[in-house]
């Protein structure tokens, strides 16, 4: 495992950086410490919310329980619409975790004044403001749809690369690379651009002028979380393919 990590860190792409970072050294690895800090904060928020919602469950939900049940119902419907009636249940936790994590990450960047917290080097920002986070999430989705396809269809899964004709093999292989690329760079680019625009406006103009832009940022941040989760569910549903008929029934 360690030789693979050293091989990855030796590649030129592993040395690409955006902005200044607060580094932590773990053995021979150099990681972005500010991303770990904000990621742990987001994870803590989600864990506390889940515990608060499930601590004293009521038959008639209210407060945080009502909010979490609404989120669960929304995620369940989203997953069902993309995978069909008989396949979606096993994937609700995965898609839901992606959606909630990205949603809270994005909103933390829009609502929390991370830049007021001083670090020895670099600055805090939303975890999804770092390309490493979005690439990791996209690779998780890639592993998930490969796993779903192999689990559902076995080795027949690989026949999709030569259907309906072997001529499409290069395009099918290329698609497996473009999916995680588009997922990661879309999310990273939108969140980074939003935080940069708001940051510049706050420096140049009074407080009340950037407020509409911040409100728009909250909306686009939620949309990006929805887009990522929807595409993840779609890719997993397409990989299984055995649900084709059920998928059509779910939309009929």
Curated annotation (Swiss-Prot):
Q: Which family does it belong to?
A: Belongs to the ATPase A chain family.
Q: What is the first-listed, main subcellular location in coarse terms?
A: membrane
Keyword set for this entry? ATP synthesis, CF(0), Hydrogen ion transport, Ion transport, Membrane, Thylakoid, Transmembrane, Transmembrane helix, Transport
Top-level taxon of origin: Bacteria
Gene that specifies this protein: atpB
Alphabetized InterPro entries for the sequence: ATP_syn_F0_a_bact/chloroplast (IPR045082), ATP_synth_F0_asu (IPR000568), ATP_synth_F0_asu_AS (IPR023011), F0_ATP_A_sf (IPR035908)
Q: How does the record classify its membrane topology?
A: Multi-pass membrane protein
> What assembly does the database describe for this protein?
F-type ATPases have 2 components, CF(1) - the catalytic core - and CF(0) - the membrane proton channel. CF(1) has five subunits: alpha(3), beta(3), gamma(1), delta(1), epsilon(1). CF(0) has three main subunits: a(1), b(2) and c(9-12). The alpha and beta chains form an alternating ring which encloses part of the gamma chain. CF(1) is attached to CF(0) by a central stalk formed by the gamma and epsilon chains, while a peripheral stalk is formed by the delta and b chains.
An example Gene Ontology CC term for this record: plasma membrane-derived thylakoid membrane
Where in or outside the cell is it found? Cellular thylakoid membrane
An example Pfam family from this entry, by short name, is ATP-synt_A
Q: Give one GO term, molecular function aspect.
A: proton-transporting ATP synthase activity, rotational mechanism
Write down what this protein is called: ATP synthase subunit a
Signal peptide limits = none
* Function as written in the Swiss-Prot or TrEMBL entry: Key component of the proton channel; it plays a direct role in the translocation of protons across the membrane.
